[in-house]
């Protein structure tokens, strides 16, 4: 009844207002390269500005599907807000969520995997080919894509396989934090990549991701994402 009683002007104001993405100018001032102060390095005032903007947007949102999906992703794929990258890592992450809210979820998971905040939060940044960290490999399956439903039968070997395939991605802290601008700088380090084959369970149709050397190793991330999203459970989830 409430919506039936709305006049055209109220409807237009509620449903057709443009969404506003994260602003950019305040973030462009570079830090001092040599011995920055704690405030300069982490930009608390800018971090507060981003947090204030995003939470006010949550509180004041109308019924925009864009903001509803943004809030969904914000809760589904959290990172640590006050991490080592300060306001720049936070800004890059928030902008990724905003731009991904009404686009391909598969593309979002790819970009989320190499987001600096996520690399730091779920330990891919510190993962090594001799001791691959399984934290993100587990969460990307259990929480972000196929879930823990009865038919999501990925195995511990699958977790280890994904972890091995993703070893080698690292953000460039110096380039992000101490440079002007707000762009993500993430590189693939071939010397830290597991070049052996990764063999997966029947849940993934016994997929084999061939180990690759050099820069070609970066392609294994694409193969992992494709493998996960080819499952029926990813669609159901």
Predicted regions and their residues:
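Short helix-loop boundary/capping segments at the starts of domains
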Residues: 75-83, 118
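Hydrophobic alpha-helical hairpins/lids featuring a short glycine-rich hinge
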Residues: 47-52, 57-73
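Cytochrome P450
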Residues: 40-44, 61-65, 82-85
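Residue-level detector of alpha-helical secondary structure
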Residues: 1-2, 72
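Active-site substrate-binding loop specific to GH73 endo-beta-N-acetylglucosaminidase modules
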Residues: 3-4, 10-36, 50-54, 86-237
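Short, solvent-exposed loop/edge-beta patches enriched in aromatic
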Residues: 59-69, 78, 99-105
């Amino acid at each position: 009844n409430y919506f039936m009683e709305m006049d055209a002007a109220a409807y237009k104001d509620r449903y057709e207002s443009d969404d506003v993405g994260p602003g950019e100018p305040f973030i462009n001032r570079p830090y001092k390269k040599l011995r920055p102060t704690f405030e300069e390095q982490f930009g608390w005032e800018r971090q507060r500005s981003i947090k204030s903007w995003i939470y006010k947007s949550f509180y004041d949102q109308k019924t925009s599907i864009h903001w509803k999906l943004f809030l969904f992703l914000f809760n589904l794929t959290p990172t640590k807000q006050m991490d080592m990258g300060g306001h720049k890592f936070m800004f890059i992450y928030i902008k990724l969520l905003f731009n991904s809210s009404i686009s391909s979820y598969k593309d979002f998971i790819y970009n989320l995997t190499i987001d600096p905040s996520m690399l730091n939060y779920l330990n891919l940044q510190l993962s090594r080919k001799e001791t691959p960290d399984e934290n993100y490999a587990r969460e990307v399956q259990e929480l972000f894509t196929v879930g823990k439903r009865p038919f999501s039968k990925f195995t511990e070997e699958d977790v280890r396989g994904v972890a091995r395939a993703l070893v080698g991605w690292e953000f460039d802290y110096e380039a992000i934090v101490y440079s002007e601008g707000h762009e993500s700088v993430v590189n693939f380090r071939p010397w830290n990549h597991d070049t052996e084959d990764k063999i997966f369970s029947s849940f993934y149709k016994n997929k084999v991701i061939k180990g690759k050397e050099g820069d070609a190793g970066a392609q294994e991330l694409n193969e992992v994402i494709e493998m996960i999203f080819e499952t029926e459970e990813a669609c159901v989830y």
